[in-house]
């Protein structure tokens, strides 16, 4: 999605990333083979570093995004969320802000219909194909919002939201973060950027934001300092947000992600305290 910040209502959304823990395990196995006298029991008991795809860290990520998108930590309450927020992208809905005007809502409903033919949203597929790329509600009104909320009670639709969130936004962000040598906070910064800006080729897309940051600093994988690079990335993100009036409130970066960065909390370890739109949030 090229997504809009919205301080309002609505619960839980991908090639598969290589988990950080798996790579660490393979590296450990190689070290054990090279040093057979090493105490295997002690080595295997050493805790592996966690990435954003660790379940507990992913839950934190969902809450952080929900605080910015829905002014609530209850991200699972957002499956049913749907409204036109006046950003030119038609209806925005669900746990990650799927939009009728940007194609990802169409992809979601197609996935749901493949898994559950004849569902309450399937009849809107022709209309969703027609309005893709526009802010039109043609063929959707008046019943689409009501039917979306009805579908959101179906665990199959909830799972479809989760899976599309992971395929389009979460997994690519984590993969790129790992490639760049970033820890949990950096992976989250990438994820939040993709949620709002998408991963297209326009000047404010995630990949363009990353390229802008790379002109100022190198990520750890290229020998750079992680904090310095992340500050450059967040600077580039703020620049991108300010290019569009609807995104001009940068508090989800300046009073959230920058706070964690300045505190040196590169692994997003609780407790976490931050603000978005002036509202305070806490994860213990």
Whereabouts are the PLM-identified features?
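C-terminal region of N-terminal signal peptides and the immediate post-cleavage residues
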Residues: 36-48
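Cell-wall polysaccharide-cleaving catalytic domain and substrate-binding groove, primarily
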Residues: 28, 32, 46-156, 160-180, ...
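N-terminal secretory signal peptides
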Residues: 1-20, 28-36
């Amino acid at each position: 999605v090229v997504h809009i910040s919205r301080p309002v209502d609505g619960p839980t959304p991908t090639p598969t990333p290589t988990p950080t823990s798996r790579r660490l395990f393979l590296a450990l196995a190689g070290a054990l083979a090279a040093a057979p006298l090493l105490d295997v029991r002690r080595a295997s008991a050493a805790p592996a570093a966690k990435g954003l795809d660790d379940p507990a860290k992913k839950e934190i990520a969902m809450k952080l995004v929900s605080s910015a998108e829905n002014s609530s930590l209850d991200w699972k309450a957002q499956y049913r969320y749907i409204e036109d927020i006046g950003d030119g992208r038609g209806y925005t809905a669900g746990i990650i802000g799927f939009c009728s005007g940007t194609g990802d809502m169409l992809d979601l409903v197609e996935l749901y219909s493949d898994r559950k033919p004849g569902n309450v949203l399937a009849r809107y597929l022709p209309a969703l194909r027609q309005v893709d790329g526009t802010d039109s509600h043609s063929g959707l009104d008046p019943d689409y919002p009501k039917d979306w909320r009805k579908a959101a009670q179906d665990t199959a639709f909830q799972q479809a939201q989760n899976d599309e969130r992971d395929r389009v936004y979460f997994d690519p962000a984590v993969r790129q973060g790992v490639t760049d040598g970033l820890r949990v906070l950096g992976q989250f910064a990438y994820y939040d950027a993709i949620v709002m800006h998408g991963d297209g080729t326009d000047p404010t897309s995630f990949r363009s934001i990353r390229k802008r940051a790379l002109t100022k600093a190198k990520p750890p994988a290229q020998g750079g300092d992680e904090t310095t690079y992340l500050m450059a990335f967040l600077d580039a993100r703020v620049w991108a947000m300010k290019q569009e009036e609807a995104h001009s409130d940068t508090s989800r970066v300046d009073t959230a992600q920058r706070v964690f960065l300045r505190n040196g909390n590169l692994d997003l370890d609780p407790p976490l305290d931050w603000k978005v739109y002036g509202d305070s949030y806490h994860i213990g």
